[in-house]
Structures are given as structure tokens and as C-alpha cells.
From Swiss-Prot:
It is an enzyme of class 1 (oxidoreductase). SMART domains: Cupin_1 (SM00835). Disulfide bonds join C33-C49. The lineage of its organism: Eukaryota, Viridiplantae, Streptophyta, Embryophyta, Tracheophyta. Pfam families: Cupin_1 (PF00190). Oligomer (believed to be a pentamer but probably hexamer). Glycans are attached at N70, N75. Mn(2+) binds at H111, H113, E118, H160. This is Oxalate oxidase GF-2.8.
């Protein structure tokens, strides 16, 4: 009986601790682990480390976000990523950043970061930021026009978007609590997957005719 109580208590404690343990990237076990992006070793969480003698002296600094991206794109926006693939020094540290630039009327389409919470600051202009709650929170849209110097927060896994409502260019910088937050662009995922989602699945799910689905697929055949 005593053993059973101990086992139940132990399982309960594990359940309480599990969300905290799985909430972000694993904790690092050394000060620096500069990613060996050319390494052949298979990695599960993070990359293998370069010897510090080969890491150089610039792995703690980057100027990649200093320059605006080219917003002459179908979405009228440009994302400059600064994750572990672009900044190997972030390996095992559980952080990354992006810069997003917007032309007037440009958008960062509805998307999801499956592995990270996001916090951002608008650097220039005015952006409509929208966050979609899950079904159990009423599928509610939380939105606000966020101006230069103001911030926003997006919980991990929630769909969200940004749209430049101003008449001038806009930009924002966002940070993630993961070295590789991942991204799922909803329109591209639905209509540009490889191989494609069968049209009957989408016609039933979206309650539209097949010709509408085929039209949307043609828009995303070449990606974003």
C-alpha cells in the first residue's frame, strides 16, 4: 500500500513537472556550443558543437538584422531570419530572432510557430497584429494596431498574422524562446503542400467547390 501511494505521488509530480520541462529548448550544459552546420552527425535537439578553437570570435555578434529586406514580394513583406541556421552561436541557447519588413499594405500571412512563444516590437510604422485563440477559447481573434515602440506577445502554437495598415513602410523585430521555432504558413500548407492535399478533402473541409480549391492551389504551386 505504501509503495502504491509513493508511485502515485511520483507520477503526479512528474505530470506537474512535465509542462515546465517541455516548454522550451533543453537547458545548455556549457557556456557556448557553436553549431557545426557542416557536421555529419545526426542531431535530435540542436547541432553538434564545433571545437572552440574553430569557432572564431564572432559567434556572439551578428549584423544580419541591420539591413531591411526586399518587400517586392507577393505578400509585400520580407522575413530576415536569425535562427541557428543563420547564427550558429545560438545553438543550445534556446533563442532566435527575426526581422520582418512590410511595404504599405504588406502582410505576414497567417502562420504558426509550433516550437516557440514569440514576443515582438514594432520598430517603424503601424501593424495590425492578430492572434487566433484555439477552439476551446472560443476561436476568438485578438487584434490591435501596434505602433512603433509598442510590443506584442504570441503564445506558442497559436495562429497569428501582421498587416501594415499605414501608408509608409513598417518593420518589426521578434524574438523566440527556441533556436529553431519552426513556421507553418497556413495558406501554403493547405494549398501548396507536397504532395498536395486531395481536393475532395479541402472542398469538404472548406465547404467550397472544387474549382475554388484548384484555383487556390494554382496560386501556391510555386510556394511563397
Amino acid at each position: 500500500m505504501g509503495y502504491s501511494k509513493t508511485l502515485v505521488a511520483g507520477l503526479f509530480a512528474m505530470l506537474l513537472l512535465a509542462p515546465a520541462v517541455l516548454a522550451t529548448d533543453p537547458d545548455p550544459l556549457q557556456d557556448f556550443c557553436v553549431a557545426d552546420l557542416d557536421g555529419k552527425a545526426v542531431s535530435v535537439n540542436g547541432h553538434t558543437c564545433k571545437p572552440m578553437s574553430e569557432a572564431g570570435d564572432d559567434f556572439l555578434f551578428s549584423s544580419k538584422l541591420a539591413k531591411a529586406g526586399n518587400t517586392s514580394t507577393p505578400n509585400g513583406s520580407a522575413v530576415t531570419e536569425l535562427d541557428v541556421a543563420e547564427w550558429p552561436g545560438t545553438n543550445t541557447l534556446g533563442v532566435s530572432m527575426n526581422r520582418v519588413d512590410f511595404a504599405p499594405g504588406g502582410t505576414n500571412p497567417p502562420h504558426i510557430h509550433p516550437r516557440a512563444t514569440e514576443i515582438g516590437i514594432v520598430m517603424k510604422g503601424e501593424l495590425l497584429v492578430g492572434i487566433l485563440g484555439s477552439l476551446d477559447s472560443g476561436n476568438k481573434l485578438y487584434s490591435r494596431v501596434v505602433r512603433a515602440g509598442e510590443t506584442f506577445l504570441i503564445p506558442r502554437g497559436l495562429m497569428h498574422f501582421q498587416f501594415n495598415v499605414g501608408k509608409t513602410e513598417a518593420s518589426m523585430v521578434v524574438s523566440f524562446n527556441s533556436q529553431n521555432p519552426g513556421i507553418v504558413f497556413v495558406p501554403l500548407t493547405l494549398f501548396g503542400s507536397n504532395p498536395p492535399i486531395p481536393t475532395p478533402v479541402l472542398t469538404k473541409a472548406l465547404r467550397v467547390e472544387a474549382r475554388v480549391v484548384e484555383l487556390l492551389k494554382s496560386k501556391f504551386a510555386a510556394g511563397f
